Regions:
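Structured, helix-rich domain cores that form ligand/interaction pockets
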Residues: 1-179
Length: 179
């Protein structure tokens, strides 16, 4: 059920340099303060290294598996955190979760568009139907407290060149996310 996660871990003098474990790490210098920040990725996760800490953002499911069709539970999330800790050579068990998105896929009998057209209004949220296979519910005010998204996961996977697991090639996959 866990989808995208945002993690923050404090950085001290004893924290090893994790930039050497990142893909395409780039340094950015603030010419006013002299602070050097490093931005890179690790198997699809966005990793940002600041003076005070390390930020990690992305889908732990995509990090653990070749796609995010299978949602993570508490056990597989712990496996993903352990793999990430091993890859960066730091302990992330005490990292703070600063953001968490929930989502899952439903295998439907009919095309996803048939179901999206049946979903009605939600209290205090506006309905946005951007294209045939995507539906969002967003807050009416300026604050974006939560967003609900429903979309065709198979079409999304094809657009992102993501391989679907065996047996899902012909499935109608309705993805639900709470962001």
């Amino acid at each position: 059920m866990y989808d995208k996660v945002k993690l923050w871990t404090a950085r001290t003098r004893e924290t090893p340099d994790v930039s050497k474990f990142l893909d395409r790490a780039k340094d950015q210098i603030d010419h006013e303060t002299g602070e050097v920040c490093t931005f890179g990725s690790l198997e699809g996760l966005k990793v940002s290294i600041y003076t005070g800490g390390i930020s990690i953002i992305g889908s732990l499911a995509k990090y653990l598996y070749p796609n995010n069709i299978y949602p993570l539970d508490r056990h597989t999330t712990a496996q993903a955190i352990e793999k990430l800790s091993d890859s960066l050579h730091i302990n992330l068990n005490d990292a703070k979760v600063t953001g968490l998105e929930f989502g899952t896929q439903f295998v439907m009998a009919h095309p996803v568009e048939n179901y999206l057209s049946k979903l009605g209004d939600m209290p205090k949220l506006l309905r946005y139907h951007f294209d045939v296979g995507t539906l969002y519910y967003k807050p009416k005010g300026k604050q974006q407290l939560k967003v609900f998204a429903f979309y065709d996961k198979k079409a999304d996977a094809v657009a992102k060149n993501m391989a679907l697991p065996v047996g899902f090639d012909e499935a109608n996959l309705l993805k639900y996310e709470m962001r």
